[in-house]
Amino acid sequence: RGLILRGIKMWNEEMIINLFFQKHKKERLLWELSTNKREEALKSLHDLKYVKKEIMHPIPYYTEKYLEKELKKFGNFTNVYYMGLSYTGMLPLKKAIERSREEDEGCIIYCGEGIGYCHTDHEEGAPLAYLLKVKNYRDIEKNYDCTFGTEGIEEWMLHE
C-alpha cells in the first residue's frame, strides 16, 4: 500500500468563510463553528443570504459528471474542501460532488484559486446552484497556512 495523495493543498473553514461570506456575518459564523452550535452554523452556511452576492453566479443543477467538467475549466482541481452537514474536510473533487448530491441542506465546495460551488435546498424542483468566483482570493489565502499535507484526509483516500 502506498500513499497516493501527496502534496495536497489544505484549506480551513476560517479561510473559506472569509472568502465567500459577507463581512458582518463572518465573526458570528466562525464563533458558532467552534462551539456546540456547530451543526446550527453549518445549516446557516447554506442560507445564501450571507454569501457575498458579487461572487455568486447562478448555474443549472448539473449532473455530477458535467459539474466536474465545468469546475475543471477553472483549474485542474483534484482535491477540494467540502463543507456540509454530514462531512467537513478534504475530499477528491469527484467524491465531493457525489457527496453534494446526498446533502439535503446543501453544501459548499472550495476548489482553490478562488473557485467554489454551492447549492441549497429548494422547496420545489432542483436545488439552487451557484458557481462562486472570488477575484482577490490571493489576498485572503495569504493570511492562512495553506500547507501541503495529508492532515484531515480520510484513511480510505490515503491508500491504494
Name these PLM-found stretches.
Residues 1-160:
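Structured alpha/beta or helical-core interaction and ligand-binding surfaces enriched in interleaved
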